[in-house]
């Protein structure tokens, strides 16, 4: 699916993650800011990429600011930002969830 508008989900509070999503041109491009990027950066990217793939998003610019979020929080924020960017908040795809 094609991203219709830029979107943000999450906060900059401790134990949360803020994900910003906008249209991209060359696949999925990440910008990750995290104190634990060396240890968990690949896992964070994998979780977000999994959500993007589930919704059929192939081109996106993803900016992530992690403040120690657990995987379930990252996944929930990723789902929220993708639904906002695809403008399907009012009609969620329950099979994806």
Swiss-Prot record:
Keyword Acetylation belongs to the record: no
Compartment(s) of residence: Cytoplasm
Keyword tags: Cytoplasm, Phosphoprotein
InterPro entries named among the record's database cross-references: CitD, Mal_deCO2ase/Cit_lyase_ACP
Location of O-(phosphoribosyl dephospho-coenzyme A)serine modifications: 14
Gene Ontology CC terms, in alphabetical order: cytoplasm
Function (record text): Covalent carrier of the coenzyme of citrate lyase.
Subunit structure as annotated in this protein's UniProt entry: Oligomer with a subunit composition of (alpha,beta,gamma)6.
Record-stated family: Belongs to the CitD family.
NCBIfam families: citD (TIGR01608), PRK13253.1 (NF009726)
Record's protein name: Citrate lyase acyl carrier protein
